[in-house]
A protein has these predicted regions:
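PAPS-dependent sulfotransferase catalytic core
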Residues: 1-122, 139, 143, 153-159, ...
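The conserved 3'-phosphoadenosine-5'-phosphosulfate
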Residues: 60-61, 68, 142, 150, ...
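Surface-exposed cleft-lining segments at the edges of enzyme active sites
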Residues: 92-93, 120-125, 178-191, 217, ...
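PAPS-dependent sulfotransferase catalytic domain
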Residues: 98-111, 163-229, 233, 237, ...
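Active-site periphery "cap/insert" segments of enzyme catalytic domains
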Residues: 124-134, 191-199
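Short N-terminal helix/helix-N-cap motif within the alpha/beta-hydrolase-1
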Residues: 127-131, 157, 224
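ATP-dependent NMP and nucleoside kinases share a basic, alpha-helical "lid"
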Residues: 127-147
Length: 320
């Protein structure tokens, strides 16, 4: 199918004129969402998919439409290498001027993919509430959803390092455990530090066959296998290369981070103890080993859950 779109071009006098351009279009919907986690490998994923011939990715990595209606500060100018990119960016401008969630127009942004696979990689979607998630999933029932999970201690430290580097978080004494905890209580950090809740929220509405959790641990240790698994799930050919980009290439890994001392690491682990155990139970997979990294017993966690369940049963029996 061909679509006609108005496009502004410059004539010989340097003035903008509106012309029509035609190009093949695909279904008006994103094929997938990547809903996090921030500092979980989402930039790596975007670069792998953007350079792959089976995918057409938006000209900017994080659209933020579902969480901020696109009203967000960007640190990098978006790509605009052809008319499809131009049309996409014009469409985003139109969406950002509206004060309501227009999922139909949002879906049409992805028509530029033609027969390829396309999606929205916005880690901030990990913070969406149940109402928005339900609306989005009901509107795009076939859409796949993936979540790149990372050990909460490591993820939070990486976010703090990025925040200081970009000037979003004031510099603090990174060797003082209690000062670090104060920064962990920053709403922008705390809301992104409970992957067990994020995954549980999305799983309530997404069909099991359309939802997958992947792990940052595998990006560090088995990037080839991780890339293959994600591409197969999304519908791409894992045997096709992502241009000249290798699976192990992760630019973010080389960026400067705050030095994490053993004392601060232990204090952060105490802060996230319950979340580490909740991740092991909710996410499974590589998350099962997270509590033991910090000397926590998962057996005691499940015993406490069982004890709470027994107490609840006795309480219900007493009420009846």
């Amino acid at each position: 199918m061909l679509a006609l779109w108005p496009f502004k071009a410059r004539n010989g006098n340097g003035r903008e004129t509106e012309v029509e351009a035609s190009f093949p279009v695909g279904d008006p919907c994103p094929d997938f969402l990547c809903v996090g986690a921030q500092k979980g490998g989402t930039s790596w994923l975007y670069r792998q998919l953007e350079a792959h011939s089976d995918f057409w990715m938006p000209p900017l990595k994080e659209l933020h439409y579902l969480d901020q209606l696109n009203r967000t500060k960007r640190f990098h100018a978006p790509r605009c290498r052809d008319q499809c990119d131009g049309f996409f960016l014009e469409g985003m401008k139109g969406l950002s001027s509206r004060s309501y969630l227009d999922l139909e127009s949002y879906g049409r942004l992805f028509q530029h993919k033609a027969a390829r696979v396309s999606g929205d990689i916005s880690p901030a979607y990990s913070t969406l509430n149940d109402e928005i998630i339900e609306r989005v999933v009901n509107h795009f029932p076939k859409m796949k959803v993936i979540f790149l999970a990372r050990d909460p201690v490591e993820r939070a430290w990486s976010q703090l390092s990025m925040g200081v580097r970009l000037g979003m978080i004031s510099r603090f004494d990174a060797t003082d455990p209690e000062e670090v905890v104060c920064n962990l209580l920053n709403p922008g950090v705390l809301v992104r530090s409970h992957p067990s809740k994020t995954v549980a929220r999305w799983k309530r509405y997404v069909r099991p066959e359309n939802f997958r959790v992947y792990f940052f641990d595998d990006l560090k240790e088995k990037p080839v296998e991780l890339r293959r698994s994600i591409l197969q799930f999304l519908g791409g050919d894992p045997d096709q290369p992502s241009g000249e980009l290798k699976p192990h290439e992760n630019n973010d890994a080389s960026r400067e981070k705050l030095r994490l001392t053993a004392r601060v690491r232990d204090r952060m682990a105490q802060f996230f103890e319950q979340e580490l155990k909740a991740c092991a139970a909710e996410l499974g997979g590589r998350a099962k080993s997270w509590p033991s990294r910090y000397g926590f017993s998962l057996l005691l966690f499940f015993w406490d859950l069982l004890d709470d369940s027994i107490d609840l049963l006795f309480w219900c029996d007493w009420i009846c």
